[in-house]
Amino acid sequence: GNKELLSQAIKKFENNGFRVFYADTKKDAVDFILKEIGEEKLVVKSKSNVTKEIGLHEYLEKNGVEVIETDLGDYILQLSKEKPAHPTGPACHLSRHEIAKIFSDSFGKNFEPDPLILTKFGKEKIRGYIEKSKIGITGANALCAEEGAAVIINNEGNINLVQMREKKHIIVTSIDKIYPNIEEAINMVKLCTYYATGAPITSYIEITSGVSKTADIEKMLFKGMQGPNEVILVLVDNGRTEAFAKGYKNLFYCIGCGNCLLDCPVYHVVGNEYGYKGYLGGRGASASFFLENPEAALENGLFFCTTCNNCEVSCPVDIGNADYSERLREEISLAGLSFPAHNQVLENIKMTKNPFGDTSKKQIKEGNEVVYYRGCMALYREKNIADSTIKLLEKLNVSYALIDEVCCGSVALRTGNKKIVKELAKENFEKIKKTGAKTVIFSCAGCLRAFMKDYPDLNDTNLEFLHSSQYFLQKIKEGKLKLKDGRKLKVTFHDPCH
């Protein structure tokens, strides 16, 4: 997102002998690469999320160029036509039995489900293609602006072979991969490797800062000694500049370790259907809003995110998808692309002040110590929750109020309808203020989050917000609420996402 750094990087790479092409769109990128391949009918490539993003493999094959993936996991997926399951282990969802069947179906002979046999066969098959190819395509984990060098990491050793093809090495990466210098890039490499595999460093770190060359004979420069005659850098924008300008720059700071997926509750259920091409999970779904279009973001699971923000906790560079997801949902709503069910919920809130469209009469009670905000679920669906909470408040002999509450607005905010939330919040706060109480307790974690986080700018009353479990625990510790002695209870605690 730093224009000066980008400009510095381009200049330095060009000074080092790279040919640099800036691709505004994915079509610009694939058209340019096809032109560079020329008459060649076979290219080998390494694993690259940017090439997945621009659809390079499919585009080249459509135009008569055979493309062979040289990462074993990606090669297996190429044969099976499946989606990747993880950025560093694309075929990790497949068992050895499934991979044996894929090889058997692809090559017309039976393979034993032995990982060593399968790996050795894959290695030999890939190596044969590499030796025949004159053009290699790789991605890049980092571009170093100060040195004009591309950093590419791998464990299999395939990238060194791919980038040493005789004719051309084409590096395809994106404008968010630029680092100030090689030291910063190596820090990223160590971080990525540790969070991806638990190892302190990857097996190979390839650093390319120019073409293969020698001047050993009378200082006469000769290019293409043991490596390619040309190194070409394709810098893909494809919506990133727009994303940076709109305040989504951090969304593209991802280093590709995949650690966020391990703690994502949605990914555990939906798997590799959640996300966009090589960019899996909530971040990928959000990024596809810019890399593709708003409709793609919907298809890739923009509304799947539970907003738990486990991804931010797990991320070594502190990328959290929840806030970005909610902002993009608002853009979806403003563009008129909301789901019919979401529109119905919004209409219900407008008409009845609750998402269910329920017109049941609410119990109202005056009190000046505590306001019990029941929430729509406890008021209209799980009424036993409200009844049980009220019983405990009665036992405490506390002066509690039950206001004529309206929806907290959480469901509206989560579905991209921000405008109505402020109206609901204002109405709730006015009713709470009238009671004179300084503590508000909630049964619903979503309602509690709404009051504490989603509209703190409206909270000028110095109110204390507590979940009912927190409030009653306080009273137990104070000795005001006593549990029956000797009673054995089995308790399940559901730790909420909010």
Residue ranges and their predicted role:
Residues 164, 178, 403, 491-498:
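Redox- and metal-dependent alpha/beta enzyme cores, enriched for Fe-S-associated oxidoreductases
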Residues 249-268, 297-319, 496:
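Cysteine-centered iron-sulfur cluster-binding motifs in ferredoxin-type domains/subunits
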Residues 273-294:
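Flexible glycine/proline-rich, aromatic-decorated loop/lid segments
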Residues 369-373, 476-498:
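Basic- and aromatic-lined ligand-binding clefts that recognize polyanionic substrates
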Residues 1-246:
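The feature marks the mature, well-folded catalytic cores of soluble enzymes
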Residues 1-102, 291-459:
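Iron-sulfur-cluster electron-transfer modules
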Residues 19, 23, 195-205, 261-277, ...:
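Flexible, glycine/charged-enriched surface loops at secondary-structure junctions
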Residues 75, 168-178, 238-241, 460-487:
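Short, flexible loop segments at boundaries between secondary-structure elements
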